[in-house]
Amino acid sequence: MTMDGVFPLTATVDYCDIFLTHDSASVRKAHNTGWKHKMQVEHYYNAEVDPAKIQSVIDNVTKAYIDAGLPGFPELIAVGVNGQRGQPVGGPPRPPQPFHNGGRPGPPGRPPMGMFPPQRPMMPPPHMRPGLSQMPPGMRPPGPPPHGFMNGSMPPPLGTPVMENGPVAGQQSQAPVAPRIHPDRLRLAGNSIKSKLVIESIYCFYPFGCLDSQIATHTFLYHCANDS
């Protein structure tokens, strides 16, 4: 603060004709999240770039993703006039949806009228349970199943090797699923400079991801001028 009580104007803001009194990341972030700054950015791009040109760049990038078949790209669903979801763009066809004649369906597994299942048989008394009545007197009941077979399944026959913390030998194990990489990172990692310019421009304008970057602004304008 100066002697006359006025803060010095030391920092400028992109897209806005104002100055900040403090040049710090927190002050710039607080300014860039305001509605006035976003409105100035929108007016700046509407005055400098044709909206039809912006949409054509976005459509070209979207089509390039679909043609390349990159993993992790969100499928584009066409919505019909009746509100039902259509077929995904560039994907296999889906089976038709079942037709419901009004009303919500009943609970699953309920039998039709007059076809109720038979009643469950009565439980035998404790002294007549299966498996215990056939045992001779004075003999103790069998103990619990061995470790790893607590769900009631039968243990494998003798001689079958069992893997620790894994499936039984002879069964196929499920292959590990590779982590899905975002298509933007794949595109930026190994493609041409032109594609990188397109992705940078999309990040800069749609949505407002790097509003305080003059370099991304000039990159976007350069690509739009040389795209035709």
Swiss-Prot record:
Biased composition (Pro residues): 105-127
Zinc finger (Matrin-type): 11-43
GO process annotations (BP): mRNA 5'-splice site recognition; spliceosomal snRNP assembly
Positions of disulphide bridges: none
Cellular localization per UniProt: Nucleus
Pfam families, alphabetized: zf-U1
The entry's keywords: Metal-binding, Nucleus, Ribonucleoprotein, RNA-binding, Zinc, Zinc-finger
PROSITE patterns: ZF_MATRIN
Gene3D superfamilies: Classic Zinc Finger
Annotated spans, Disordered: 83-127
GO cellular component assignments: commitment complex; U1 snRNP; U2-type prespliceosome
InterPro entries noted in UniProt: Matrin/U1-C_Znf_C2H2 (IPR000690), U1-CZ_Znf_C2H2 (IPR013085), U1_snRNP-C (IPR017340), Znf_C2H2_sf (IPR036236)
Molecular function terms, GO-annotated: mRNA binding; pre-mRNA 5'-splice site binding; U1 snRNA binding; zinc ion binding
Keyword Repressor: no
PANTHER family for this protein: U1 SMALL NUCLEAR RIBONUCLEOPROTEIN C
Role: Component of the spliceosomal U1 snRNP, which is essential for recognition of the pre-mRNA 5' splice-site and the subsequent assembly of the spliceosome. U1-C is directly involved in initial 5' splice-site recognition for both constitutive and regulated alternative splicing. The interaction with the 5' splice-site seems to precede base-pairing between the pre-mRNA and the U1 snRNA. Stimulates commitment or early (E) complex formation by stabilizing the base pairing of the 5' end of the U1 snRNA and the 5' splice-site region.
Subunit structure: U1 snRNP is composed of the 7 core Sm proteins B/B', D1, D2, D3, E, F and G that assemble in a heptameric protein ring on the Sm site of the small nuclear RNA to form the core snRNP, and at least 3 U1 snRNP-specific proteins U1-70K, U1-A and U1-C. U1-C interacts with U1 snRNA and the 5' splice-site region of the pre-mRNA.
Family: Belongs to the U1 small nuclear ribonucleoprotein C family.
UniProt name for this protein: U1 small nuclear ribonucleoprotein C
Lineage: Eukaryota, Fungi, Fungi incertae sedis, Chytridiomycota, Chytridiomycota incertae sedis
